[in-house]
Amino acid sequence: KIGFSGFSDLKIEIAKEDFSQKKEHPTSVKYYDEIANNLTEALYSTIRLLDEEKLNEAIKMITQSKNIYIFGVGSSGNTSLDLENMFLRVGVQAKAVLDPHFQSQVASLLTVNDLVIIFSLSGKTKDTYDSLKIAKKNGAKIIAITNYIHSPIGKSADLVLQTAIEEFLNGGSLDGKISQLYICDLLVHGYEQNNNIDSVELREKVLRSIIDKSID
C-alpha cells in the first residue's frame, strides 16, 4: 500500500499532487477566465458523453412512474432539490430526499411502479448506495447520474446518465454542479416535449402562487 491506509487515500494524494502542481505552475490566464474555461469544459465534456438513446429511455421511465424520488447527499443533495423544483414547473411532483436515514425509509416502501433518480459524482456514496440496494430489492427502477459508470452505484442502476469532471477533488465544485444541472435540464425539457406539456400555463400558475405570497 506504499504507506497509504487504503486505495481511497492513494487517490486523494494523487489528486492533491496534481492540484499542487497546477498551483506551483500558474498560467497567465486570469482566475475569472480560468473558472469560465473550467465550467465550459465540464459542460462540453458532459455533452460528449451524452447517450441520446439512454436519455430518451430515462424520460420514458419518468413518464411511466407513479412516484419519483431523488436521492443525493452533500452537494449532490442540493442538485436533488434543484431537480425537484425544475420538475414541479412542468407538472411532475418528484420528491428530493437528502437525509440518508429517510432515504432508507423511503426506499423500503417503494414498488415496481416507482422510480429513484440518484445523484452521486463519485458513484461510491455509501449511504446513497445502501438506499439504492433497498429500492432495487423492492423492484423500483433506478436512474443514476454519476461521473463513473463502473462505480457501485453506476453498475447497480437500471440506467446511467454520465457527467464529466476532470479532477477527483472537484466533486463539490461548481464544475460538477454544472454537469449535473445540464442533465437535469435535458430530463425536464425532454419530458416537457414528449408529453406536450403546456409549460407556459404551468409556470404562470406557479408564478401566480409566488406573487400571492408577496407583501404589497
Residue ranges and their predicted role:
Residues 1-54:
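HTH-adjacent hinge/linker in prokaryotic transcriptional regulators
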Residues 13, 17, 61, 205-209:
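Short acidic/histidine-centered micro-motifs embedded in hydrophobic/aromatic stretches
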Residues 45-48, 60, 108:
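Surface-exposed charged/polar residues within alpha-helices that form helix-capping/stabilizing sites
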Residues 53-65:
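Glycine-rich phosphate/diphosphate-binding loops that line cofactor/substrate pockets in enzymes
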Residues 63-182, 186-195:
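Glycine-rich phosphate-binding loops that contact phosphosugars or nucleotide phosphates
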Residues 197-216:
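A short, charged, Gly/Pro-tolerant segment at domain boundaries
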